[in-house]
Amino acid sequence: MARRPLLEFEKPLIELEQQIEQIRQLARDSEVDVSQQLLQLETLAARRREEIFQNLTPAQKIQVARHPHRPSTLDFIQMFCDDWVELHGDRRGSDDQALVGGLGRIGDRSVVLLGHQKGRDTKENVARNFGMATPGGYRKALRLMEHADRFGLPIFAFIDTPGAYAGLLAEEQGQGEAIAVNLREMFRLRVPIIATVIGEGGSGGALGIGVADRLLMFEHSVYTVASPEACASILWRDAAKAPEAAAALRITGKDLLSLGVVDEVLAEPSGGNNWAPLEAGATLREALERNLSELLALPPQELRDQRYRKFRAMGRFIDQASSDADSAS
């Protein structure tokens, strides 16, 4: 079995991974019983991996969120969705491959699913534009969401993008307008919307499909107004300060849950979703079904009212001096 690519902070695991692979090769090439040694090494590696991932910095979480083997939108759809039919095109001459969507069934309920889609290698990433959607992608997403609204189908959105594509052609085609229209129209939809940040959630590109009744987020995903690299370049004129920017931006699930931006943080397997994709898929499915059950109990107008109030409550300023004074009293 090929060894999974390890991130920079996982280097303490390299020697263990090499030993495990050598023992596996020995077991394949001979009749020697190495099950006990293999179990001991795998247990030790799992324990060390858990120790590492319990103390990740925001900058390290970004590396996990960008891992090339992290489950994508289509991966999750294939894990727990039956009768999946992808729908194409925005009916204006575009079929953006960076944002996919379609119809499917989860259990006995039909739903509309859509999300950003990255590639596994350079060729796929070029075809998918590295998960950066164009105006056509956001218009395709809106077409599918309007279809869901017309037929009373819940919407599941999966966010995984460094941001909307910022090329000249995208701007000429109305990138800002396409995202703005999505924001406006998503507030008007009468069906439940659940969005999940499965990897990166970058800027307006993420928000373009992120106006939801419930916003979920995986433990090692990130959700930010700008990438730390861009933030560091703007504030300090030095992209090398990205780790400091990542900490200041408060992009982790724990931070965003405390700020009221996300509603639930989903636990990941030890080592991140890329180590146990099926376990991650089961976690996501359970969370989607549970939250959907709660939202289906609400009438459409109440759904829209709660959605509006949820986003209006974001962005409140906290004066630290006043907060300290209140605590003292």
UniProtKB/Swiss-Prot annotation:
NCBIfam families: accA, AccA_sub, PRK05724.1. The gene is accA. GO terms for cellular component: acetyl-CoA carboxylase complex. HAMAP family: AcetylCoA_CT_alpha. Its EC number is 2.1.3.15. The keyword Secreted does not apply. Its main location: cytoplasm. Acetyl-CoA carboxylase is a heterohexamer composed of biotin carboxyl carrier protein (AccB), biotin carboxylase (AccC) and two subunits each of ACCase subunit alpha (AccA) and ACCase subunit beta (AccD). It catalyses: N(6)-carboxybiotinyl-L-lysyl-[protein] + acetyl-CoA = N(6)-biotinyl-L-lysyl-[protein] + malonyl-CoA. This is Acetyl-coenzyme A carboxylase carboxyl transferase subunit alpha. One of its GO terms (molecular function) is carboxyl- or carbamoyltransferase activity. The keyword 4Fe-4S does not apply. Pathway: Lipid metabolism; malonyl-CoA biosynthesis; malonyl-CoA from acetyl-CoA: step 1/1. GO terms for biological process: fatty acid biosynthetic process; malonyl-CoA biosynthetic process. It is found in: Cytoplasm. PROSITE patterns: COA_CT_CTER (PS50989). Component of the acetyl coenzyme A carboxylase (ACC) complex. First, biotin carboxylase catalyzes the carboxylation of biotin on its carrier protein (BCCP) and then the CO(2) group is transferred by the carboxyltransferase to acetyl-CoA to form malonyl-CoA. Residues 40-294 form the CoA carboxyltransferase C-terminal domain. Belongs to the AccA family. Keywords: ATP-binding, Cytoplasm, Fatty acid biosynthesis, Fatty acid metabolism, Lipid biosynthesis, Lipid metabolism, Nucleotide-binding, Transferase. InterPro entries: Acetyl_CoA_COase_a_su, ClpP/crotonase-like_dom_sf, COA_CT_C. It comes from the Bacteria. Gene3D superfamilies: 2-enoyl-CoA Hydratase, Chain A, domain 1.
